[in-house]
Amino acid sequence: MIKMKNKRIRNIVTAIALIGASAAASAQTEADPDSLSAWRSVPQTTVSDGHLLGAVSSVEGDALIDPYNTNLANTLFGMVPGLFVSQANGEPGADDASLWGRGVGTFGSGRSLQIVIDGFPSTIDFFNQLSPYEIEKIELLKDAAATAIYGNRAANGVLIVTTKRGTDRPLKIDFGVRCGFQKAIRMPEYLGAYDYASLYNEALANEGKAPLYDKNALEAYRTGSNPLLYPDVDWTSEMMRSLSPVANYHLTARGGSQTVKYFVLFNGVNNTGLFKNPETAAEYGKKYRHSRYNFRTNVDVRLTPRLTAGLIIGGSVEDKYTPGTSESAWNLIDCMSSVPSNAFPVFAAEGMPGGNSMYANPLAELTERGYISYNGRTAQAAIRLTEDLGFITKGLSLSAGINFNSWFRSYSNKTRNYARYEIAKDDSGETVYNMTGEDTALSGDESSSSQWRNLAVEATLAYDRTFGKHHVSAMGRFCFDDSTTSSGSLPYRNLGFAFAVNYTYGGRYMAEFTSGYYGNDNFPPYARYGFFPAGAIGWVISNEEFLRGNGIVNLLKFRASCGLVGNADIGGSRFMYNQYWKYGGSYFFGTSNSGMDTYVEDRLANPDVTWEKDLKVNVGIDVRLLNCLSFSADWFMNRRIDILTKPYDVVPAWLGVSMPDLNIGKVDNTGVELTLGYSGLAADWRWSARGIFSYAHNKVIYNAEAPQEYSYRLGTGHIVDQPFRLEAIGFFRNHEDIDNSPKQIFGDVVPGDIKYRDQNGDGIINQDDFVPVGFTSTPEMNLGLDLGAGWRGFDIRLNFHGAFNRTVYLEGRPYQAFQNNGTVSSFALGRWTPETADTATYPRLALTGNRNNYQSSTFWTRNGNFLKLRNLQFGYTFRDSALKRARIEDIKLYLNVSNVFSLDCMDGWADPECLYGYPAVRIMSLGFNVRF
């Protein structure tokens, strides 16, 4: 124990706030989700899990530290029942994951969870910028009983983030560093010059044209005898490293007394990405790199015996430099995949990039084109006062707070053009260099920026008291927030009131009523507010006399809830209830040459526009046995109505006006969630296992779609965003096969082209033959498995994550050969030829006239299911007397690997989540953590 005076504490905390240090605390703890002694937060009140009636799942912040991720959302894979997480990009600073609560419940534009950070509304952009080291707990509120207090923001679920705060114990300092390397997972393999040229000739032959490359050229490509005139460039290896460094470091201080409690954090991450950073890049701009620094100070002060004040100051500083002309690395990846390996050498001569008028030089795009600078800043400042009103009546308290959030992004463009050179032979056989483009100076601007600011005010009156066998808790809440963006001149405002009351008799029988009354300025003044009620009941059977104290059944609880919540994020334009007019040209009266401006009616107003409404029903059970085995299950059914929809089947097109979107859409969403946990201790051994399963299936009930001649063309009755595609049934074998098959209208077909099924039997393959196929890339099922074990100082942890009932679609250059004069990947090696007609896995090659084969069809779809080992960590913790004498609590050393492997159906072509663009990465890191 370190004992010190208040002045010394203040000095150390001040120093800590100014110091930077480095990553990866290894301690992980996770609150038992079913323990009667565990507590979960509802705004400004606390409810024990034994009395909790809503569907709420949670994860402790320390459990999110192990996976090496700079984006908080990417630490949540398989961690929270009901939370669906999907990542489609591995680029540092652009690797945001998508989050859904209980899947997708609407086909409207607003599908995102409502984010609440420390009791105040926030956004997913803010959430992604948080560091795992500053998180105390993340909770997902799922049913109406848990979310109704958020009113018209609750339909998609609410994600509650609680940051760490101080304690009344002596100062604890936590310092850690982790460094390692990252490598790409499953990048496309593009063919070398010889294979590319051979397949190019084959594609020409399929079109009845003469070959472009003769035998001498093919032999030169094969042997590499003349790399200048017959180059063979692996652009992937020229531009990207097999390994690149990463670093993460953190420093926290936590402690306090009965009077002052504090938590201070600094966390920094650095990533230089997978691109090579040649020294030549320094002349024309920045090398690729991404960094982010998080800071936080949370302080709680007891001003009087009854009054406490809480202060929050937090934020992040993010900087990213991307070579080239785009903020995203996608352009560099696309350029790399567009240039054939035999197009030109990397350099025509020293200091002279190869290139021609058709293709840019990928390496020069990386090193010669300048850079885009991206700078992001987030800030949160909040203060909350809480007064104990026990002098009025026991258990009464009043809390009020104000919060300011700022999210700012700026972009600086510093780009240039460069000369590139094509090698050729003149008539005398001399080597000449034909120049395309010219070298220019760096130029650009710094005028591009975006900003979001939010001011929120909240006040809560809470009551919590026990009268014998009767326990009553209640709260009333007022909240207001005002948001402004750089792209809009008018603010976005929300105002609401909430009320909740919970009654428990004898710790066995429970009833709860929650409600919200919320308004949003996007709706008509006469219909701006809505009432969102919910009710829940529960029975803790384990507290009945016949089960109490039996030693086997520690908890057995049934619960059920039903209620109505809303979603004000409906999309469309603002203030749709207003009628707007637009310029309609000039009208000439009489013989005058001067016309009068006219105005015509724009899209019709919708005076009844309103929010989406979601009727939620939830039934659940929580079980804990022998103080080591826990189980919970939930079944839910949601009916979303009043989804903003284009009224294609309501108003005929010949009406002559643009109709407004109407609140007439309906979607059902049903599913189940299961959680099973086990933990144990024996002598020096300890172990734990926790598995979660989430299933959510949606169905469009009504979307006002236009009538179709064939019912299978309707989206109604299918999942939201149901893909419609042609059904591929093989390849045409010969001309006789073509003549005897339905006519495909997408272009002339020849043997080796994809053959489609005639769904309606009319002898023609056209738009009427597109049918519902598979799922979307958003999974319907999620699986998580967290395994841990330890012996004395050793520990090991594994995190598995699976996603099922998902379909992915392959498109673009990595999968479609010669697309837009691009290159060819190994994906096309199984192409159709007369000799491989029975075993071909890819259509015949062609340079032009390939429109038939690139139709959206089942040929290009793949089963997107996967099971990944997301995280593996092995460590050892030192706790001996020598460390204690040095006032060191413990030191931990550990090895961590993220994205260890994936079991999927992609046959090694690509990662099932990151199909194209910047690849997913595997990170191997070593770290140490010291606690004082």
Question: At which residue positions do the language-model features occur?
Answer:
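Conserved small-residue
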Residues: 174-227, 325-326, 681-777, 817
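Glycine-rich, aromatic-lined ligand/substrate-binding cores of catalytic
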Residues: 776-809
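Extracytoplasmic gating/loop element in the C-terminal half of outer-membrane beta-barrel translocons
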Residues: 212, 339-348, 803-893, 897
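Extracellular/periplasmic, surface-exposed regions of secreted and cell-surface proteins
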Residues: 25, 298-309, 313-317, 326, ...
